[in-house]
Amino acid sequence: MTIAVGRARQERGWFDIVDDWLKRDRFVFIGWSGLLLFPCAYLALGGWLTGTTFVTSWYTHGLASSYLEGCNFLTVAVSTPADSMGHSLLLLWGPEAQGDFTRWCQIGGLWTFVAFHGALGLIGFMLRQFEIARLVGVRPYNAIAFSAPIAVFVSVFLIYPLGQSSWFFAPSFGVAAIFRFLLFFQGFHNWTLNPFHMMGVAGVLGGALLCAIHGATVENTLYKDGEAASTFRAFEPTQAEETYSMVTANRYWSQIFGIAFSNKRWLHFFMLFVPVTGLWMSSIGVVGLALNLRAYDFISQETRAAEDPEFETFYTKNILLNEGIRAWMAPQDQPHERFEFPEEVLPRGNAL
């Protein structure tokens, strides 16, 4: 008698079949994350292209914002809903639009459509990096690094307006619209003097500096086995092997600064840490602005400048500029509020 020892073959369910199809080796990997990424990215990009091409902002901001109205690439935008809409999701079938697509576009429904699908698309892209890292067998630091721009997007476009009175105070999706939002942030929140913004700038510019230094150092220390060292003819662009010297790079920077990275792991972790931490700090700062937390205030300088016409600092100058932004921007930016500022309340510098 023959006895066969082994496990009984389990029946493959629908989950296994779908899993196999999603993870099949193809030119563009789909994966489970692709079920979130591709539809959301397609809808967000399509909504933005539709809005910038055809949809006006007359009913929400009193502005022209589409190619159809004569704007160019730098001035088109998908504008935020009107302040009166509050934090409504503005669903097409909701009480505001009532299934009317034209009305939905006019009241700013495309902005919430693009914002939420865009956020989900970015999250899907991060999950895609996690999924592929697991399948390939590498660490998920790419996905962790990508969490930084996701944090910035979510904090600026979603959390900040949730802390304010409506979606109206979020940035509209357009180049000039983002610039207007930056001026708004400075005038109403003194954003450049916020310590979290300072850390964000240090992280982004520090990351750019590290990237430039790293690339230049690798180019400087290239060599090719079997031939004389040459920076400019040291390698073929398609070669597989590494042909730069970490030892030489370490010696070079040790002579310049007195210190240098001792190994590639610490060097590349630092290049990851600096910009990612900077972006996360900036995101935390924006969450603080959603709660109307203040930046640095140097009251003693403001008090002395108010009492002494000859005393003025760059800080007090900036405070006056912020007051000017608020006074001149509010009537333009929020015409529905019908602000009126008499000339005597508009800010003036001490030299005027």
UniProtKB/Swiss-Prot annotation:
Transmembrane segments: 40-60, 124-140, 152-165, 207-227, 278-294
Annotated catalysed reactions: 2 a plastoquinone + 4 hnu + 2 H2O = 2 a plastoquinol + O2
Cofactor detail note: The D1/D2 heterodimer binds P680, chlorophylls that are the primary electron donor of PSII, and subsequent electron acceptors. It shares a non-heme iron and each subunit binds pheophytin, quinone, additional chlorophylls, carotenoids and lipids. There is also a Cl(-1) ion associated with D1 and D2, which is required for oxygen evolution. The PSII complex binds additional chlorophylls, carotenoids and specific lipids.
Residues binding chlorophyll a ChlzD2: H117
EC number: 1.10.3.9
Binding site for Fe cation: H214, H268
Xref: Gene3D superfamilies: Photosystem II protein D1-like
GO BP annotation list: photosynthetic electron transport in photosystem II
SUPFAM superfamilies given in the database record: Bacterial photosystem II reaction centre, L and M subunits
Enzyme class, first EC level, given as a word: oxidoreductase
Main location: membrane
Keywords, ordered alphabetically: Chlorophyll, Chromophore, Electron transport, Iron, Magnesium, Membrane, Metal-binding, Oxidoreductase, Photosynthesis, Photosystem II, Thylakoid, Transmembrane, Transmembrane helix, Transport
NCBIfam families: psbD
The protein's name: Photosystem II D2 protein
Gene that encodes the chain: psbD1
